């Protein structure tokens, strides 16, 4: 009984979730808690619903790189409290 495995399980559970910040161009920051192996599309859709935006209107980037809907925090080596940047999709060109 010396090996108390539930304690290990608790640690794993804590490490399984990650807190991410999503920073908009207007300076707003929205926090999300997501599992490391959950596709980021879930976070992206939740952010859009919360902000009243369409997925087609904005782009998500992490460390300057575009994020695909199928990417997971684990694949992108995200750590707790990392920030995802949101940019408005640029349309058109010269006035």
From Swiss-Prot:
Its main location: nucleus. It is found in: Nucleus; Nucleus, PML body. It comes from the Eukaryota. One of its GO terms (biological process) is protein sumoylation. There is a cross-link at residue 1 (Peptide (Met-Gly) (interchain with G-Cter in ubiquitin)). There is a cross-link at residue 93 (Glycyl lysine isopeptide (Gly-Lys) (interchain with K-? in acceptor proteins)). One of its GO terms (cellular component) is nucleus. CDD domains: Ubl_SUMO2_3_4. Gene3D superfamilies: Phosphatidylinositol 3-kinase Catalytic Subunit, Chain A, domain 1 (3.10.20.90). GO terms for molecular function: protein tag activity; RNA binding; SUMO transferase activity; ubiquitin protein ligase binding; ubiquitin-like protein ligase binding. Changing residue 11 to R: Abolishes the formation of poly(SUMO) chains. There is a cross-link at residue 11 (Glycyl lysine isopeptide (Lys-Gly) (interchain with G-Cter in SUMO1)). Keywords: Acetylation, Host-virus interaction, Isopeptide bond, Nucleus, Ubl conjugation, Ubl conjugation pathway. Pfam families: Rad60-SLD (PF11976). Residues 16-95 form the Ubiquitin-like domain. Polymeric chains can be formed through Lys-11 cross-linking. Polymeric SUMO2 chains undergo 'Lys-6'-, 'Lys-11'-, 'Lys-48'- and 'Lys-63'-linked polyubiquitination by RNF4. Cleavage of precursor form by SENP1 or SENP2 is necessary for function. Interacts with SAE2 and UBE2I. Interacts with ZNF451. Identified in a complex with ZNF451 and UBE2I/UBC9, where one ZNF451 interacts with one UBE2I/UBC9 and two SUMO2 chains, one bound to the UBE2I/UBC9 active site and the other to another region of the same UBE2I/UBC9 molecule. Covalently attached to a number of proteins. Interacts with PELP1. Interacts with USP25; the interaction sumoylates USP25. Interacts with SIMC1, CASP8AP2, RNF111 and SOBP (via SIM domains). Interacts with MTA1. Interacts with HINT1. Belongs to the ubiquitin family. SUMO subfamily. Ubiquitin-like protein that can be covalently attached to proteins as a monomer or as a lysine-linked polymer. Covalent attachment via an isopeptide bond to its substrates requires prior activation by the E1 complex SAE1-SAE2 and linkage to the E2 enzyme UBE2I, and can be promoted by an E3 ligase such as PIAS1-4, RANBP2, CBX4 or ZNF451. This post-translational modification on lysine residues of proteins plays a crucial role in a number of cellular processes such as nuclear transport, DNA replication and repair, mitosis and signal transduction. This is Small ubiquitin-related modifier 2. It comes from Homo sapiens (Human).
